[in-house]
Amino acid sequence: MYSAVRTMNKKIVVIGGGAAGMMAALSAAEQGAQVTLLEPNERLGKKLNITGKGRCNVTNNTDIEGLLANIPRNGKFLYSAFNRFNSADAMNFFEKLGVPLKTERGNRVFPVSDSAFDISAALERRLKALKVQVIRDRASALKIEDGAVCGVVGERGRYSAEAVVLATGGVSYPATGSTGEGHRMAAEAGHTITPLQG
C-alpha cells in the first residue's frame, strides 16, 4: 500500500475486523508479516457495510488540505498519515482490488455499484490472497510481559505476537460490535485515553 515497502518477518495480531483492522492487516501482510486478525462478528466489516447508507463513502477526492479542512478538531494531527496514504492512494488501492469508483457531489467517492459490500468483499479477498489468518474470537485482554505487549487473550484462545494492533473502533453503533473494549485494553496497557467530545 505504501511506495516504500519494508520487508518484515514478524508475527502480528490485529484486533478488529472493521475497515481499520482489515487495512492494518493488509499493510502488515504486504510487508511480509505473519498476520492473525481477530474478529468476533460472523462477517468482517460489519459497520463498514452500513456506512454511507450502505454505499460506503470511501474517501473524498481532494488534496490533504481539503481533507483536513473537514475534520472538526485537531485535523493537523492527521497530516502525516494523509501524507503517506492520501485520497488518490485510497482510490488507486480499491480500483486495483477490482472496485470501480465514482466521484459525486462534494467530491465524495463511492463504489460504482453503490454497495459497501463490494468494498468489504474486496478487502476480504485481498486478506485471503495474502494468507491473513482470520479467527472468529473476541479479544478480552492484552498479554503483557515485562511492560511489553506480547499477545492477546481471547475468549476462545491465546495468541502470541511480536506486535498487536488495536483496531476495535469506538463505542458508536454497538449493534455492530463496537463496545469500546479496545479503549479498555489500551488503558490497561498504560495508554492515556482521551474522552471523545461531541
Residue ranges and their predicted role:
Residues L78-A88, R105-R125, V171-G177:
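Short beta-strand to alpha-helix junction loop
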Residues R55-T103:
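Glycine-rich active-site loop/strand segments that organize a redox cofactor
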Residues N9-K11, E104, A161:
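Phosphate-coordination loops involved in phosphoryl transfer and adenosine-cofactor binding
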Residues K10-L37:
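N-terminal Rossmann-like FAD-binding beta1-loop-alpha1 element of flavoenzymes
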Residues A29-K53:
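Glycine-rich FAD pyrophosphate-binding loop
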Residues D118, A122-G198:
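Predominantly flavin-linked oxidoreductase catalytic cores and closely associated redox partners
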Residues Q31-A33, L97, L130, A189:
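Conserved dinucleotide-binding and phosphotransfer motif residues
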Residues M1-T7:
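N-terminal amphipathic/basic-hydrophobic helices that include classical n-h-c signal peptides
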